[in-house]
Every structure is written in structure tokens, then in C-alpha cells.
Amino acid sequence: QTHRLVAHQFDQGQEMHAELLKVWENRKDEVGYLGNALYSMVTTLKAHIADLKATTAAKERIEGEMSAARAIQMGMLPHNFGEPAPGARFDLHAVLEPAKAVGGDLFDFFPLDEHRLFFLIGDVSDKGVAAALFMAVTKTLFAVEAKRDSASVGGIMERVNHSLCENNPEGMFVTVFAGILDLRTGEISFSDGGHELPFLLRHDGGAAMIEKKKGGLVLGFVAESVYRNDLIQLQPGEGLVIYTDGVTEAMNGDHELFNATRLGDSLAAISPDCSARTVIDRVMNSVRAFVGEHPQSDDITLLALRWHGPSGNGPPAAD
């Protein structure tokens, strides 16, 4: 009888339980004690398996929901860059390489009129679906406010910030760098809300972080925050590289950060004739080579922009 019990499979359920219970009731010797022990073990194991199945199903459901949230988030970002047309006055490319968790990085760009290009990059303070939703709201507000009144980048920031603060029960915030490039003059009017300062790509080669300005607070924190306008004057062939802290805080196996110095060195090694796409690709390659197999903990977002002059010298013939 004991051999028959051992031969049973755990998923035979009630039949096995009944036999174990019968052994336990009819025998008071070692076999009875064994039956009692087996009965307790099987009962515990079945409960554990049931819990495990429920946990696995819940985990798979959550992972599916997070994957869907990430897909929706990525779908909101510009993704069809194409190649700059000959004679184009500017060249722009951007990338967002997501970490496993749903994050809140964002970028956007769009023409305000025939001669002005709006662009921004941002980083929401948190992770998860809430951060993705906050990112979507932020991106939408910037598009609405910039197209409604683009006289001042600082004014756009103030209106977006006020809207974010009005309904923000989770206390989330977002760092933002936003600007308007005048394609006729190469002048960039920009405003900074607690974001990393970009690098200037010089027309004769090299790169340098732009001069430190008195930036504003992160958006979503204080409704009455004031955001100033600052100016950068580009020469033909010059541009900007804007990034989130996922770039400079990328970590290798020795727990060293990629940092702004390494980013500057990587940019300085890139030919001034390279396209915006190539600038992005080479920086990403530098980050990946530095990080190695260490897992990515944050979204990595980069935006590169070059101005080719008022008449447009077009993109480089080759990179």
C-alpha cells in the first residue's frame, strides 16, 4: 500500500489525500506516522504550488501591462527621422534606449513655423506606469503651449509647470531643457528646468558644456516658478547634444559612472562633419563599451542637433 502511495502523482489530488488519510487513521505505528507526515507534506506542497501559480500569473500579467505601457510610451515619441535633404538648414537625431522598467524620459521636436524649430528633452523623477503617464502629459502640454504662444521659451515652461502643479497628487516632477532654433540666424533661445546642461559641438571640432546659467526649478514642484530665457549663437556647422542623466550615470562593473567628462571626451573625438545620427551612434557606442555587461538601471536619452547655416549647406556627404 505504501508503494502505491509513492507511485501517485501530486496532481491526482483528492484520491491521494483520501488514501493518505486512510493510512493515517488505520495505522498507529511507523507507517501511520509516515502517512501523517506525507499527508501534511502534500497538503503544504499543494498550497505552495497554488500560491506559486497565482504569483507567476500575476507577475506575467504585470510584466505584460508594463510592456504595453512601454510600447505606448515609445510610440508617442518621434521615430521617423529619415535622412536630411540636400540643402537642409538643420540636422537632428534622437534616441531613447529604455531600461527594463518603464521610465519617464522624453524628447520631442516640431516646427513652429517656416523658420523656427522647437525641441526639448526631459526626465521624470520616478519609474513605472505613473512616470510614463506623467511623461505623456508633459510632452502633450509642451506641444500645446509651444504652438499656442512661442514668444518665450521661459513662458512656455512656466505655463507647462503651472499645469503640472495643478493636478499632481503623487508629487512627481520632471527636469526639462527646451529650446527654439531660429533657422535663419542660428540663434537658440532656451530655458532650463533643473536639467543637465548640453554640450556645444563646435564647427572646428571639439565640444564643450555650455556656460552655466541660473536655471529654473524642476517642473511640477512649485507652481509660481519663474523660468528665464537664455541664448546660444550657433555658427554654421555647430550644434547641441542634449541628454538625460541616464547617460552620465551609466555604471560599469566597477561601479564607476560614465560622467560628463567622458561624455565630453567622446563628443570631442567626433569629426565636425559627422551627421547628427552619427554623433548619437558614436556616443551610444562609447556608453555601451564603458558599461559592458553591467545591467542598465535608467533610460538613456540623447538628442543631437546641427545647424547648417541660413541657406543650408546640407548634411555631410559621408560620415
What positions do the PLM features span?
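Signal-transmission coiled-coil "S-helix"-like helices
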Residues: 29, 39-53, 248, 271-274
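… and, occasionally, acidic/histidine-rich disordered N-termini of signaling adaptors
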Residues: 21, 51-241, 282, 289, ...
